[in-house]
C-alpha cells in the first residue's frame, strides 16, 4: 500500500517588491491562458451488490475489443481504483478525448448497451473539462501506474497565468532529472477550480522525489508558494489502468 504524497509542484512567481514594473508583469502574466489540448471526463461508479473487480475486469476486456472496432481513435480510456482500500467497492472511469463530445457519448452508449448498469451504478454526466499535459513521461510503456488527483482552487487574485513561468521552471527541473513522473492540469469552466494530476511510474516514487528533487534548494520555496497561492480541498491516490 502506498502512502499518499502531496506533491506541491505549483509555483507562483510573486515578488514582495511593489514596483510598477512588477505590477505590469503580474498583470501581463494573469492574462496568459492555458493552451488546452484535450477534454477530460470522470465518471464515478459504485459496484452493485454481488459484483467484484473480476466482473469489472471481464466486462472492460470485452469493451476494449468492441471499442477498437468502432475506430474511435481520439479517446483514451482509464480505470482508477482507490489505492488505500483493501476492499474496493468503487472505481472511476477516466476518459480523455480530443475535444470530441460525440466520441465520449458513443463510448458511454457502448458501456450501457453491454450492461455496465448490471455491474455498477455510474454517474455519466459529461462535463468536458479542459486539460493540458504540463509534463509528459513517454519512456514508460507500463499501462499500470499511480495517479494522485488534487482538487484545488486559486486564491483570490491568482490564476493559471500567474504561475506559468514557474511551471516551466519546474518542468525543466523534473525533465533534467529524468524523474518517472507526469503532470496534468484540468480546469473547470469558472477558471478558478482545477485538478492537479500527478502520475507516478514507479513504486518507490516517494524515495525518488525525496532524493532527487526535494533536496534542491528551491523546493521549499515551491512548497511555500503553493500553499500561499492555492488551496487544495483534498487529494486522492489511485491505481490507474490504461485500457485504450
How does the language model describe each region?
Residues 1-21:
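Classical Sec-dependent N-terminal signal peptides that target proteins to the secretory pathway
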Amino acid at each position: 500500500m502506498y502512502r499518499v504524497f502531496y506533491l506541491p509542484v505549483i509555483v507562483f512567481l510573486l515578488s514582495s517588491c511593489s514596483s510598477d514594473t512588477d505590477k505590469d508583469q503580474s498583470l501581463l502574466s494573469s492574462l496568459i491562458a492555458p493552451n488546452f489540448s484535450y477534454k477530460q471526463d470522470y465518471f464515478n461508479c459504485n459496484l452493485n451488490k454481488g459484483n467484484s473487480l473480476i466482473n469489472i475486469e471481464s466486462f472492460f476486456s470485452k469493451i476494449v475489443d468492441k471499442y477498437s472496432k468502432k475506430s474511435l481513435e481520439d479517446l483514451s480510456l482509464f480505470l482508477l481504483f482507490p489505492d488505500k482500500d483493501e476492499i474496493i467497492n468503487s472505481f472511476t472511469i477516466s476518459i480523455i478525448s480530443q475535444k470530441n463530445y460525440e466520441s465520449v457519448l458513443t463510448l458511454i452508449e457502448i458501456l450501457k448497451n453491454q450492461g455496465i448498469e448490471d455491474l455498477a451504478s455510474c454517474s455519466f454526466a459529461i462535463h468536458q473539462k479542459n486539460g493540458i499535459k504540463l509534463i509528459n513521461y513517454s519512456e514508460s510503456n507500463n499501462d499500470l501506474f499511480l495517479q494522485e488527483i488534487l482538487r484545488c482552487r486559486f486564491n483570490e487574485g491568482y490564476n493559471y497565468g500567474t504561475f506559468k513561468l514557474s511551471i516551466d521552471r519546474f518542468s525543466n527541473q523534473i525533465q533534467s532529472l529524468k524523474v518517472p513522473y507526469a503532470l496534468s492540469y484540468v480546469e473547470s469552466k469558472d477558471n478558478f477550480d482545477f485538478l492537479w494530476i500527478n502520475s507516478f511510474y514507479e513504486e518507490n516514487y516517494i524515495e525518488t522525489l525525496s532524493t532527487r528533487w526535494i533536496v534542491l534548494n528551491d523546493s521549499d520555496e515551491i512548497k511555500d508558494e503553493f500553499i500561499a497561492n492555492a488551496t487544495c480541498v483534498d487529494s486522492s491516490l489511485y491505481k490507474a489502468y490504461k485500457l485504450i
